[in-house]
From Swiss-Prot:
The gene is purM. The keyword Transmembrane does not apply. It comes from Finegoldia magna (strain ATCC 29328 / DSM 20472 / WAL 2508) (Peptostreptococcus magnus). GO terms for molecular function: ATP binding; phosphoribosylamine-glycine ligase activity; phosphoribosylformylglycinamidine cyclo-ligase activity. This is Phosphoribosylformylglycinamidine cyclo-ligase. It is an enzyme of class 6 (ligase). Its main location: cytoplasm. Its EC number is 6.3.3.1. It catalyses: 2-formamido-N(1)-(5-O-phospho-beta-D-ribosyl)acetamidine + ATP = 5-amino-1-(5-phospho-beta-D-ribosyl)imidazole + ADP + phosphate + H(+).
Length: 341
């Protein structure tokens, strides 16, 4: 008998099994706009455009980085899919867009249907939180490129916004106010530094951390800010939005600012999430490096006119009680200044 694809490490039967398992999971994210099910060559989506004068599609793509390694070590795979959606959708939200649909890509050394189902279940949960549809994806089994139990994730989000409502930060001026939306923890960036800090302090993922374990605390999925931004857009003019990912406030806030405008942040050290204080202690990491790597408890920064601050906080705090004014826009060549109190 001749060589088969299965002999070379690719099991098509497991691929078929995975498709059957995930079909119902994916279907739960579909509304009437989705015209196709799983298994076709492409996903079809018919957006509702009647309320838009000049609709513009907004796209974003990202991954989860080395947080996946943590999921592998804990053998817990049902939350990194939420991270994947969050990393893409939160970027799309920064332009004022409403998320429409999402696609995922999973690459692995050996297809494990139950594990893949957990991953897709997380993606579907992220899509539900984002109010967007999971309309397609790809699972690639690549023995020789990945170890048997290794995998990687990539995602692609598409949203829509009316052209005259695109948020690009160009109208931000001196005196405007920055509002912070709280993060759920480390989110999906800086995990290479986290792992190095754990190794330096000989801290194990199974060690106790407050009311949970170190591993479980670090694995908490990235917050998705669709509800906050959607609610605010209905009532207030948002001038700029920054998703605080790798590089922290220092690298992400400038991406929404016009020239010669910066934000001076006032942050209380007592309000910084304990997980960041622990990482800093484990790795003896300098404070500037912490703020240059992690979100430090701020997952998104929204800029509004000073007259809209109270109304904005009233809206946002119904969803995120920790939302607060965190800074003021000033004329300066320094994009970000952090006052730690």
């Amino acid at each position: 008998m001749g060589l088969t694809y299965k002999d070379s490490g690719v099991d098509k039967e497991k691929g078929y099994e995975e498709v059957q398992i995930i079909k119902e999971i994916v279907k739960k994210t579909h509304g009437k706009e989705v015209l196709t099910g799983i298994g076709g060559f492409a996903g079809l989506f018919k957006p509702e455009l009647t309320d838009m004068k000049e609709p513009v599609l907004v796209s974003g793509t990202d991954g989860v980085g080395t947080k996946i390694k943590l999921a592998m070590e804990l053998d817990k795979h049902d939350t990194v899919g939420i991270d994947l959606v969050a990393m893409c959708v939160n970027d799309v939200l920064c332009q004022g867009a409403k998320p429409l649909f999402f696609l995922d890509y999973i690459a692995t050394g050996s297809l494990k249907p139950a594990k893949m189902a957990d991953l897709v279940r997380g993606v579907a949960e992220g899509c539900s939180q984002s109010e967007c549809a999971l309309i397609g994806g790809e699972t690639a089994e690549m023995p020789g490129l990945y170890k048997e139990n290794d995998y990687d994730l990539a995602g692609f989000a598409v949203g829509i916004v009316d052209r005259d409502k695109i948020i690009d930060g160009s109208g931000i001026k001196e005196g405007d106010v920055a509002i912070s939306l709280s993060s759920s923890g480390v989110h999906s960036n800086g995990f290479s530094l986290v792992r190095a800090a754990l190794d330096m302090a000989n801290v194990k993922l199974s060690d106790k951390f407050e009311d949970t374990t170190v591993g479980e605390r670090l694995l908490v999925p990235t917050r998705i800010y669709e509800k906050e931004i959607s609610a605010l857009l209905k009532e207030v003019e948002i001038k700029g939005i920054a998703h605080i990912t790798g590089g922290g406030l220092y690298e992400n806030v400038p991406r929404m600012l016009p020239e010669n405008i910066g934000i001076e942040f006032d942050i209380k050290e007592s309000e910084i999430d304990s997980v960041f204080k622990a990482i800093q202690k484990w790795g003896n990491v300098e404070t500037k490096e912490m703020f240059s790597t992690f979100n430090m408890g701020i997952g998104m920064v929204v800029v509004v006119d000073a007259k809209d601050v109270d109304k904005s906080l009233e809206i946002l705090q119904k969803i995120d009680p920790k939302a607060k004014q965190c800074g003021v826009c000033k004329k300066t060549e320094t994009s970000v200044k952090i006052n730690l109190k």
